[in-house]
Amino acid sequence: MLAFSDMNTGAGKIENGKKALKIVVVGDGAVGKTCLLLAFSKGEIPTAYVPTVFENFSHVMKYKNEEFILHLWDTAGQEEYDRLRPLSYADSDVVLLCFAVNNRTSFDNISTKWEPEIKHYIDTAKTVLVGLKVDLRKDGSDDVTKQEGDDLCQKLGCVAYIEASSVAKIGLNEVFEKSVDCIFSNKPVPKASVTTQAKSQESTQQKKKSKCLLQ
């Protein structure tokens, strides 16, 4: 097993001669995080919803004539796991900020909960915004639009906004290919807006004041 010894480098690692990175998936419960990981890595779709506490496994992905080892970490979105969830964040290279396009609350929570939480604990990790369940989007409804996702991506300074569907097998490879590219390529990461940067600095200051994660 790969030991991530250098905290929050955001630079990937080498394991058994292959480039490796740790990817953590966060977002509200039931937005499709587990389905995303299983559909991508195993081609499976769970038949029933079972809330995740912690789950992690590795997957070898072939991309650009090279093999990459992806260490995938699934996390619980429920509030009762708020104190435990950050234990999975250490040494993360990429964080997937996930919401369901047919669940506006999950979209709003990216800005109010998930992005601030990630910046608080692992502010050097790259972030990819992922809109899941695009196969369930209905025109003329209150569903989150592609433009709204693009705008939020730019506001938060995410590497990219990608829409995906585990059931329809849309965008799955793109999510993880982009994750690899943002770590092992030299392309600059978009800068967050001034407002977002100010919030991140405030979050970092709060982190320095906290003495214990678990009580």
Curated annotation (Swiss-Prot):
Residues 194-215 are annotated as: Disordered. The gene is RHO1. Small GTPase which cycles between active GTP-bound and inactive GDP-bound states. Involved in actin cytoskeleton remodeling. Regulates phagocytosis by modulating actin cytoskeleton dynamics through the recruitment of formin1 and profilin1 to the phagocytosis nucleation site. One of its GO terms (molecular function) is GTP binding. The lineage of its organism: Eukaryota, Amoebozoa, Evosea, Archamoebae, Mastigamoebida. Changing residue 45 to L: Increases the rate of nucleotide exchange. Disruption phenotype: RNAi-mediated knockdown causes a delay in phagocytosis which fails to complete. Slight reduction in F-actin levels. Recruitment of formin1 and profilin1 to the phagocytic cup is impaired. Adhesion to host cells is reduced. Belongs to the small GTPase superfamily. Rho family. This is Ras-like GTP-binding protein RHO1.
